[in-house]
Amino acid sequence: PEMSFEIVSINKFIQFYFCVPRELKEFVEGQFYAQYPTVEISAADDYTEKIFEEKYAVGYDVQTTKEDVYPIKTFQSFEVDPLSGITSVLSQLSANEEVWIQICVSPASDQWQKKATSFVKAIKSGNDPNEPIWKTILGGLGTIAKTVSAPPTQTASAPTQVDISGPAALAMSGIETKSTKLGFKSKIRVISLSGDYHRARANAGSVAGVLKQFTQTNM
């Protein structure tokens, strides 16, 4: 099933929405109450169905720049709640401006976990998995030094030993940690509305900028 979680600023008022299958409604509500005991949840009309007059809309989809086995930053990596950066941008909008941020998720199969596990094993053993991601790690994560040694009495080469350090080691650790979690297919969309095109574009850019805080720059 697909679920949608949204952060919206309308008339200088920041609101949070979620849309899930009816059979998951109570479960999802329970998750919110567990984390935020004082939260108030109620049914709401679809804010996207209203008529917009004399407003410009600028929108885009957010995509990762690396293969999906790589992790993004999660809340454990932040000293300050990353949500505050997003709400700070939304709080600066004018009364006639709006920004919608939508995150659509649906459960993913275990194939991505198998891909991550196979990738890490291949790198550690010195084998080339013959995948584009292998080129990514070589080109973007630093040099992987290979030390090959063989007994002097044998003509066959011994198994390759791979020394991994620096950003590559951090990447391996991050990929291994991520592969132990449940996975979701996700899509992030952003729409900015304003009576002025340049303001709509600028607000959309501000949201894009704050979303970059989830990038793992050391990988």
Q: What are these model-derived regions, one by one?
A:
Residues 1-219:
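Extended, folded cores of ATP/NTP-driven motor/assembly subunits in large transport
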